[in-house]
Amino acid sequence: MVLQENIPVPHFVLFPFIAQGHIIPMIDIAKLLAQHGAIVTIFTTPKNASRFTSVLSRAVSSGLQINLVKLNFPSEQAGLPDGCENFDMVDISKDIMYSLFHAVSLLHKSAEELFDKLSPKPNCIISDFCIPWTCQLAEKHQIPRISFHVTKEKIPVAMEEQQLKEFVEKMNEAEMKSYGEIINTFEELEEEYVNDYKKERNDKVWCVGPVSLCNKDYLDKAERGNIASISEQNCLKFLDLHKPKSVVYVCLGSLCNLASSQLVELALGLEETKIPFIWVIRDGTNKTQELEKWVSDEKFEERNKGRGLIIRGWAPQMVILSHPSIGGFLTHCGWNSTLEGISVGVPMATWPLFGDQFLNEKLVTQVLKIGVSLGVKVVMQFGEEEKLGIVVKKESIKEAICNVMDEGDEESKERRERASELSEIGKKAIEKGGSSYINMTLLIQDIIQLQSKHQS
């Protein structure tokens, strides 16, 4: 979409939350808005900005109008370790979670000072629902605030603590005042739910996904979210060695805090499948340090040389999932990962950890019927993982993965066919003339009309 010359170019200001699952789709939304002719400014902190600077630099070089405003993060003032600006930079406990939310609330004043100086004047705020003070910014400047939700539920289960009650109340209050909501999904995926939600929100709901598909450039795919901890060449070299649909990709998200004993059980389950695998583990946490000791002592990587690849830290997930050799995805059912799996037509084995992930699992396994559940019923509580210990036995892990990867079974074939069909629908949705493309156009037109009314 290219805006007509006589139409004022709208200026959207985006406020992503300080967690990878929130930042990544918001950056994609920024690119989509700019591709439709809008001016976009993103407010974030220095270390979070560094994760997508190269992606944005390429976007700007291509002619997109995207600007970046960096807010100094008050780590020390909030009682956080120096340099901690994201949920994935630290072992999460309930106290740490409270401190991170508190730090975000402290950004209000500096953000307001910089927002007031923006030129051209902003016409709309798109804010993560976890940043309620953006509602006050919108009211001050008499512009709409559109809420961005990563999750299906309004408040993640892990946040239902008394000390976080004040934050939750502020979020709910801001939601009541929001002009509308932008969602990373496509209408055809969950049509009934979308239609009902539109009625609830007075039709101010815009489904613009799968937003990950805005990344056409290979480097944009490889560096989406962060620079990978493994070279794409090494990753592709491993994948190229294996037959189509023969490798299972295992990633339980950037906030996976499973007990070390459970991670060992996962390793054993993977090994017993005899199926080639890529396994992504968090780097630098206490849990993974214990896992690393076990991996070294037991010579796990040597035992699985050529068949298994462990990626420590950030992985180029889009590059991996879209490779022909990937035949299944063991996922925590975070919405971004779920939608990325759907986008490339890969069936899933589901291992939800907390929050909306249990709802997403039901969508994948019971509604869309493109996944197999590992049968997890226990919600992971941050800081209490060791008390839970082993929730899923290696036998269940092996069974679910083998079920998903089986190409001879009729049920597995049907699952794979459904996943492939949804992938094609998702790709069409974001292309010109598709439902998500049209929704992005309608959103921009809505803001332009509001802008015109305000000026007249």
Report residues per predicted region:
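Glycosyltransferase specificity loop/lid
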Residues: 1-247, 251-456
